[in-house]
Design a protein with these regions (language model features):
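Beta-strand-turn-beta hairpins that frame and shape the catalytic cleft
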Residues: 1-3, 115-124, 173-177, 204-206
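Active-site neighborhood of phospho(di)ester-bond hydrolases with catalytic His/Asp-centered motifs
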Residues: 6-7, 31-36, 59-64, 126, ...
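Short active-site segment of divalent metal-dependent hydrolases/proteases
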Residues: 11, 38-39, 130, 167, ...
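Metallo-beta-lactamase
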Residues: 87-122, 146
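Anionic-ligand binding region
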Residues: 140-171, 177-178
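Acidic, His/Gly-rich catalytic cores of divalent-metal-dependent hydrolytic chemistry
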Residues: 171-239
Length: 239
């Protein structure tokens, strides 16, 4: 079985299409998305609709940006315990207003996490591991294998898939895999969309990171032309 892994698309339809085309070439059987389909970028509706076209092969969970849409914006940002600025709030509302009812209903149907079995292996899928109160655990950008074991100690699986930090990380310890493919839709001074392919054959697990090139300048130009709320900060932080 061949499984395409993505996370943190963040409304970047150009990056998503580049990765989906690569998945088509590789003939993946399933696509797993670890949350944050929307937010930050300029094409939330197109992003959700592109995934809906592959709904039969898609397994996805909610990220914090889906929670912002469905549960309301938080009083403070979970990672750095600060209040959202007025510009950030306006940006989220701008992003949310571009979504159709169909897309919102699809995002509402997503669970916070999933425990599934594929190819005889148990997978745990989540945007980021949570504490008992539903808030995210400590934000670790470059976790060690020991960090991963601690992060997911309440969960039992052979393969743990997550995102949120936007950074690539893979650890394999005690016959367990911990995989974060990095943000697909936030190139951060690169010209690539990040993804991965997980292969499960005859009880063996293999993982390959894939970096798909696309025209990031075109996306940046669109953002500059739109001049939507918080766009300058978004370009500086995520592009």
């Amino acid at each position: 079985m061949k499984i395409g892994i993505i996370t943190d698309i963040h409304s970047n339809i150009q990056a998503l299409n580049a990765v989906l085309n690569e998945f088509d070439k590789l003939k993946v059987d399933k696509i797993i998305c670890c949350g944050d389909l929307i937010g930050i970028g300029i094409n939330p509706e197109e992003t959700v609709q592109a995934l809906l076209k592959r709904k039969e092969m898609l397994i996805a969970v909610r990220g914090n940006h889906e929670q912002y849409l469905l549960k309301g914006l938080p009083k403070e940002i979970h990672d750095d315990k600060r209040k959202m600025s007025e510009k950030e709030i306006a940006n989220h509302k701008w992003n949310h207003n571009k979504l159709s009812d169909q897309s919102i209903n699809f995002l509402r149907s997503l669970e916070i996490s999933q425990n599934i079995e594929l190819g005889g292996k148990r997978l745990y899928i989540v945007h980021y591991p949570q504490q008992a109160d539903g808030t995210y655990k400590k934000h670790i950008k470059n976790p060690s294998a020991t960090d991963n074991v601690e992060m997911f100690k309440e969960n039992d699986a052979d393969i743990f898939l997550y995102g949120h930090t936007h950074t690539f990380s893979v650890n394999n310890i005690n016959d367990k895999w911990y995989i974060n493919t990095g943000a697909l839709g936030c190139p951060m001074n690169s010209n690539i969309a990040r993804a991965g392919v997980l292969k499960i054959n005859d009880e063996q697990i293999k993982f390959e990171s894939i970096n798909v090139e696309y025209n990031v300048k075109e996306v940046i130009d669109e953002i500059n032309n739109l001049k939507f709320p918080f766009y300058e900060e978004i370009l500086k932080i995520f592009y």
